[in-house]
Amino acid sequence: MVEVRVWAPQAQVVEVQVADGERLALQRSADSADGEWLGAVPDGVRYQLLVDGGPGLVDPVATQVWFADDHRRTAPNAWAEAVRWPQPQSSRWTSRPLVVGEAHAHGLTRTRERPDAGKLSAIIDELPRLSSIGVSVLELLPIHQFDPAENNYWGYMPLVFGAVHQLYGTADDLAEVVAAAHELDMEIWVDVVVNHTTEEDEHGPTFNLRGLADADYYAHDADGGYINDAGCGNIIDATSAPAQRLVMAGLDRLADLGIDGFRFDLAAVLARDPEFVRSIGDWAAGRRVRLIAEPWDLARYLLGRDFPDRRWSQWNGKFRDDMRGFLRGEGGLVPAVMRRVQGSPDLFDEPLRSINFLTAHDGFTMYDLVAYDRKHNDANGWGGTDGTDDNRSWNCGWEGEVGVPAEVEVLRRRQLRNAMTLLLLSHGTPMFVVGDEFGRTQGGNNNPYNQDNATTWTDWARRDDFASLEAFVSGVVAVRAAHPVLTQAEPWGRDVEWFGANGPPDLAPHSRSIAWHVGGLYVMANMWWEGIDFTVQVPGAWRVAIDTGFDTTSENGLVDRSVAAEPVGTSISVGPRSIIVLTAP
């Protein structure tokens, strides 16, 4: 038998309806004030919950969900399946520096020629390549159950927090992915959406929480309406004990699969109860899992020290914005770039808590960042009104890929190398989207949340054309791994030295270049559209390890040539929109 435990404090009668028509009454908890109803169902059966004879509801802590053929968004017909969860396995943190690759569990393998393309099981064969280029963490977009009738590809409208989306596979499949990653000294993180649900507002469908205990699970305003700080119709009431228990039940269950880290979508919603956020931190310490916050929602921006628990890592949106601006040649950003390169000390006491990224699932891909000046979202069905207009991108002089001149494509490849260099040689924890390393594109769509098609599926054919870029990324990750200063827990402080082209750093509004020296690295970054001669201002037997400024699409930017810098004063020409990295032998 499988236990059924339901929170429905206002109910007079709660029953389980089994698929064969049998009804089983649940019993109110011995503490009648508790609001909990208890019972059990046979292993393997499909069942729904009935509250006071109302329509069938999905158990919010179901282990698996099944949808009838006549299921529709406007007339839900979904059933819990009493399937036992796999035997618990432990997390296993990587021994390597963290380099995070974000991917969609379905889209990553959808175009592979194999029977299980688009399934969790297919991910296992992608892990060796990722490991070989230095990715030590695969972060999967939401894998929990959502409504397949909703036209939502990303999965950010959850139905059951602790069940695996049935179109991707089973909990056993996910456990096998985790085990395979651990064998390669890799971690698996999953993106969890526990701040809102697929039930939307009062006009949305009722699947479970609204029919069980609406007032306890959702946050409401003074007029009784749903607070919509997630932009999806509702938010979980993070101050409510039943809602907190539901969140923790889902996390506990996924942690039992050996998941190594959880990235919390719109974590500022949970921070409405700071003590709850800290209790999640305590739980994570006991389970040995990492916590990563998207530290904002529509109402609050809690990046850095404003977030209520310093043990959480955070997506650093300021790194994204400042570095994108610098990359495209905006003036006046040198002071901001200096902060981002050294782990954002204005925001974080511990640099590795900063998840540095230029791209994520929402927004442009890395290639689209250098190929489009504006979003191209018409296919999403909102007349181009969805998605941000603040992309901070530059198309290198030509919009899109159709008919692109050769010299523009050369510049784009250089900009891609620049982007990866800035990302991977900054202090903090770098993240990029899997496919960025070989020029993945979404055709300029920066919000393809409902595009379950070639727009979002990984196009593996591009690997051949962008082989040099993939080799470059692997090489820069190797440079990163060889310089512990980039992955140390302590801030750089006074260990980093900053320079301009021929003296102290140029912090003027027109400046577009900066150099720095730390831990055996000397980096010269020129985002101006003309070349600049940099004077090497630290003596040593330097070698050029990286030069992004090649004028072909086949060069990978990895070089190895000596530079005489004894005494100080050697001049190195850094080309237009280029970066040169020196390493000490």
Language model regions located:
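Hydrophobic faces of well-ordered beta-strands that scaffold small-molecule active sites
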Residues: 99-101, 138, 188-190, 262, ...
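C-terminal beta-strand-rich structural cap/linker in extracellular carbohydrate-active enzymes
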Residues: 44-46, 562-585
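The feature marks proteins involved in alpha-glucan
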Residues: 1, 23-102, 107-115, 122
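Conserved alpha/beta catalytic core and glycan-binding cleft of carbohydrate-active enzymes
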Residues: 66, 70-74, 78, 272, ...
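Carbohydrate-binding surface patches
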Residues: 1-5, 9-12, 498-537
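Glycan-recognition and catalytic regions of carbohydrate-active enzymes
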Residues: 409, 416-444, 463-521
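Substrate-binding/active-site clefts of carbohydrate-active enzymes
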Residues: 104-258, 267-284, 290, 332, ...
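C-terminal accessory region downstream of the catalytic core in glycan-modifying enzymes
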Residues: 476-477, 530-563
